[in-house]
Amino acid sequence: MAGYDPKSIERKWQEVWAGERTWEVANPGQPGFEADKPKSYVLEMLPYPSGEPHVGHLKCYAVGDAIAHFRRRHGFEVIHPMGYDAFGLPAENHAIKTGQHPRESTNAAIAEFQRQFRSWGVSIDWTRE
């Protein structure tokens, strides 16, 4: 396929989705809330922000993302939030490994997760992070 540049095409659509706030869902009482529309909640296991995102994360979130897209296409209002399991031994070990305070190492890892998940095009409602 001559002239196909996936990075520019993906970047274009990611900017469109962000600009249109495509994956955001209004809460009751907010403009845009549709009371009669069926609701769905999709939540994958929360990742440990104790390192770099990897193909295992993509594998897990690809399934949840497919479910979220399927339900949207079938008329559901889908909440697909993001969160992190940032407590306990994995966070402590990562902080020790990086020589940083746990808050600093966790925040840096979360920033990398956000960057990578956006680049993958996962349909996360980032307002519900």
Model-derived features: positions:
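N-terminal, positively charged nucleic-acid-binding surface of large information/translation enzymes
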Residues: 1-129
